[in-house]
Amino acid sequence: MTDLSDPTAAARAAATTINSAAGIDSHDIALVLGSGWGGAADLLGETISEVPAAEVPGFHAPAVEGHGATLRTVRIAASGKHALVLGSRTHYYEGKGVRAVAHGVRTAAAAGCSSLVLTNGCGGLNRNWAAGTPVLISDHINLTGTSPIEGANFVDLTDLYSPRMRAIAKDIDPSLDEGVYAQFRGPHYETPAEVRMAGIQIGRASCRERV
């Protein structure tokens, strides 16, 4: 496993591997595919490179069913820009630490990505949402007690979930709903009391990656 004692160096090494495999200098946007979202990458455009996650520094084969095992570069049909599709995600409950959880996002930034789209499979408390309903995250409650930020870096999270990007999504599909997402540590599921005190969406991924 790659040494993550220097997260920035590890991300640069992974980004170099990914960009070289795709034959490009940089990527434009990153997409992290959560449980059940694997097929979304096929709708974006032409895949020009696909690397097994285990062959990229700092990544490993997914430990959870429903996640892809590759890092894919897709040329978006409409714009010609390059998307880095991260099919492999590390969850905190796997015991690899917060640096491993944030490694994918740090790698995306090192690869040149200036925008990030996170997806996950989570529970919803709105009874109007049928299973599989896509819902935007408007804000989050981090109940894990952990952060990917180290040292005296006081990052402003006011607009963490971009109002601009959410507006674009709603322009495309006005029926999209949104709500506050609460993340627990896992791997166990939440108690009924924990569910009642949390947000309207509940899961075990995304918050630390977004930070």
Residue ranges and their predicted role:
Residues 50, 151, 155, 176-178, ...:
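A generic, residue-level signal for flexible/boundary positions that often mark functional hotspots
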Residues 159-200:
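Active-site rim beta-loop-alpha module in soluble metabolic enzymes
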Residues 5, 95, 160, 185-186, ...:
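Residue-level marker of alpha-helix boundaries and capping positions
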Residues 202-211:
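Residue-level detector of conserved catalytic or cofactor/ligand-binding positions
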Residues 29, 118, 178-180, 208:
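Residue-level detector of family-conserved "landmark" positions at structurally sensitive sites
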Residues 13, 103-106, 164, 168, ...:
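Short Gly/charged-rich anion-binding patches and loops
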Residues 2-157:
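Metabolite-binding pocket within alpha/beta catalytic cores that recognizes anionic/polar moieties
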